[in-house]
Amino acid sequence: MNGLVFDIAHLLAGSLVLVSMMMLYQDRLYALLNVFALHSLVLTLSVAWQAFIQDAPHLYVTAAIALLFKAIVIPVALHRMIRQLGIHREIETVVGIGPTMLAGIGLVALAMVVMLRVTPDANPLAREDLAFALSVLLLGLLVMITRRNAVSQVVGFMSLENGLVLAATGARGMPLVVEISVAFSILIAFIVIGVFLFRIRERFDTVDVRALDDFKGRRRK
């Protein structure tokens, strides 16, 4: 029974890494948002399973928060924002998809090696979940670095935060009060980012980070 419990936990955490790799492959905003919704859904299942095996009821609330806000509310709101702003739906990348995917594979390998070596005495389930969580975190950071569009960078940041939640729940769980504060912080940040994007669109007629950098450079001359 314990073996099956560990296998399911590893399957869900590994699936989260796989969906993070899928995010790197996307070149359209709508597809990226759909994959992020799937990312958050897998996180929900992983946290709910951790709640079951740890007998930690507060983690069910964490899973519900992830499902409601990250898998439903935020992706739907970003879809509407893209339509209202008329944002260019193709994602411009700093490098090609191929090199980005190779970099992602390298980061996953690095996360596995580092985490398994620095936590030799940890609980096996927690140890491997932390390795998966670090992989998700690094892949989210890679999404932020390799995308020029501000919306895709926001999605990368939120996927990075999913990795942090996976790490917290996989270790010993996260106190409910902390998770609620994190959820509200993310919601507030999302509202601020939405207003910020509207203002950028009104002022510069684009949300492309490269175009904003070019404008900043011209102002300095």
Where are these regions (language model features)?
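Alpha-helical transmembrane segments of multi-pass membrane proteins predominantly involved
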Residues: M1-K221
